Regions:
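Carbohydrate-associated surface elements
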Residues: 186, 209
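A short helix/loop element that forms part of the nucleotide-sugar donor recognition site in Leloir-type
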Residues: 57-64, 216-229
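A short, well-ordered alpha-helix in the C-terminal region of glycosyltransferases
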Residues: 363, 370, 377-391, 401
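Nucleotide-activated donor-binding/catalytic signature segment of Leloir-type glycosyltransferases, i.e.
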Residues: 264, 273-297
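N-terminal subdomain of nucleotide-sugar transferases
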Residues: 1-70
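Nucleotide-sugar-dependent
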Residues: 246, 290-301, 306-327, 332-345
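Conserved donor-binding/catalytic core segment of Leloir-type glycosyltransferases
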Residues: 230-246, 252-256, 264
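Membrane-proximal helix-turn-helix segments that form the acceptor-binding/catalytic region
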Residues: 123-126, 130-134, 160-182
Length: 413
């Protein structure tokens, strides 16, 4: 029996290595794992911009940059970033501009066996479909967060005309795709409810993962801790986007109730300025910007307890990928998120942390008090989480799932 020929795949994504966005880390590893399986991959992405919301030094000067790799190619285009993260219109126009330019760039290169397009931004659905029309490979639409649901839930989008357009774009993108991949059963139910019954079998769950060789448990006494002026006291850490989807007011309330601990918010986003102003009278709260990728394991090791807070309703439309990274670092998770959704299920299965209802300061602080009171138990949670993630979130397994999905689309299954 002869082996099937290697696949030729086009990948359209808003971030790719060396960009530091979590979704960029995920898709970069998937691409490298697909290449390790012998496949040819051609990536169309943005110039690196995520950390400061501006194109990184050394990458400017051209709207389109192309490079050949051992496994295919990378085409990077201008993402039209805006430094004002609170200006939603400016950000939306940037997404549209990036989607259009990446779409034009993706039309080069001949026929492929599949087009994998990653959302958000939701506009990549139409970009992927246009690429499919020219390059003939079936469209696989990968959903990291369900949009516009998350934006509507948080009140980031309230204009009914904008919501109607976004819903239309979402519906069209799902129906044009040969397959839609989501991260959890909750997201599958959400997407399946928006497509016709005959198309629901096209929605597949392929979870995210973490690089457990890169992120490993390490000593809590890190240089990062020293840089922030923190001693040996317990550190409660939030790392990630500082936006309106995250209930970061819980962090400040906990800081008021637990002056013996230091609370670190590591990241940036539209809500950081207001959150930092609100924390001005809290001496046990530290803020720091995104760190380079190579420092991520060190940042994670700094925290004794890590936080995953999402506002009510968002646990059903989003699976924070940071949860996998925290577990890989051997640290316990305290999640404030909708019960019965993917993160609480993950923590229950792994023993790697606890979950409380969202937006409930008393429940949040009660759970944190228990974790702070028993360092030995929190260390055991961290070890259990690491053990679970080693077996449940393999990059190679995720790449094989995409390979099998594309093979199935080729054969009409």
């Amino acid at each position: 029996m002869t082996s099937p020929r290697p696949l030729r795949i086009a990948v359209l994504c808003p971030h790719f290595d060396p960009d530091t966005a979590p979704t960029g880390v995920v898709i970069s590893r998937i691409v490298h794992e697909l290449a390790a399986l012998g496949h040819e991959v051609h990536v169309v992405t943005a110039l690196p911009w995520y950390r400061e919301h501006r194109i990184e030094p050394g990458w400017g000067g051209k709207w389109v940059q192309r490079e050949r790799t051992e496994w295919g190619s990378i085409t990077r285009v201008n993402p039209f970033p805006g430094t004002d993260k609170r200006n939603l219109l400016r950000r939306a126009l940037g997404f549209v501009g990036f989607s259009a330019l990446s779409g034009l760039a993706s039309l080069r290169g001949g026929r492929v066996d599949a087009v994998i397009a990653m959302s958000p931004p939701l506009t990549m659905g139409l970009t992927g479909w246009c690429t499919h029309l020219v390059r003939r490979g079936p469209l696989v639409f990968n959903i990291q967060d369900v949009f516009p649901d998350a934006a509507v839930e948080t009140g980031a989008i309230t204009n009914r005309h904008v919501i109607r357009i976004a819903r239309w774009l979402e519906r069209v993108s799902y129906h044009r795709a040969a397959a839609v991949t989501v991260l959890s059963d909750d997201l599958r139910d959400n997407v399946a409810a928006k497509v016709s019954a005959s198309r629901r079998s096209r929605v597949h769950v392929i979870p995210n993962f973490v690089d457990t060789e890169f992120i490993v448990p390490a000593d809590r006494r890190t240089p990062f801790r020293h840089e922030l002026g923190i001693g040996d006291e317990p550190v409660v850490l939030y790392a990630g986007n500082v936006g309106f989807s995250q209930s970061l007011g819980l962090v400040l309330e906990a800081a008021r109730r637990f002056p013996e601990a230091t609370f670190v918010v590591n990241g940036d986003g539209a809500a950081r300025a207001s959150l930092q102003a609100e924390a001005a009278d809290l001496p046990n709260v530290r803020f720091s910007g995104y760190q380079p990728k190579e420092r991520v394991p060190e940042v994670l090791a700094t925290g004794d307890i890590h936080l995953v807070p999402l506002k009510q309703g968002l646990g059903r439309v989003s699976v924070p990928s940071k949860t996998y990274s925290i577990l890989a670092a051997g640290r316990p998770v305290l999640a404030a998120i909708d019960p019965g959704t993917e993160v609480p299920r993950m923590l229950a299965a792994s023993g790697g942390g606890v979950a409380v209802p969202p937006d409930d300061p008393d429940a949040f602080c009660a759970a944190l008090a228990e974790l702070l009171a028993d360092p030995a138990d929190t260390a055991a949670m961290g070890a259990a989480g690491r053990e679970w993630v080693l077996g449940a979130a393999s990059p190679a397994a995720v790449a094989r799932a995409y390979e099998q999905l594309v093979r199935g689309l080729q054969s009409g299954r």
